[in-house]
Amino acid sequence: MEQILKYLQEAHPKPDPLLLELEDHGRRDGIPVVSRETGRLLSTIVHAMQATRILEIGTAYGYSTLWMALAQPRIGRIWTIDPDIRRTEIALSYFRRAEEDDFIEVFNTPALELLENFTHRNLDVVFIDANKAEYRAYLDLAVPMLKLSGLVIVDDCLSDLDAMRSFNEYFLNHPDLDATILPLGNGTGIGARKR
């Protein structure tokens, strides 16, 4: 599998230089970022859907945010949530350098607290990559915010099977989603809202 991943990384064009810099920054600071493959998947989905209304739960340094922002139409909007102001200040510096800061709104508050009062609906994409213990609650609050056929994408579904097993079963059997989990990165769940 390592050989296949190496081949794919070499076959793809190099990501935007800011993304490479951000990968390195996260690695140096010990801040986890999604895999490059997951970033490419997010970018491809956002581009294919021409997604203009995206909610991200878990910003960190903004690596996944930037993958989506660079693929999004210039009329789009990303709302991203992370209570850690120090990390989101770093993210904002990269958004400014990429000239994407006008299209991204950062909320420094606990995600569940914000989601309970979040007024935006008909979202194209919701990306979840935050506190794993709260994944189910995030999902329950986020699915009704999606437009019909909108996507919820979940990172780290296979990172710790014992910890994620219950959530994964809930996600795959969610009555409002047509969902699957791909062995991409640390496991990427994708669910389309069907009702």
Please place each PLM-identified region on the residue numbering.
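A short alpha-helical cap/connector motif
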Residues: 1-125, 132-153, 157-195
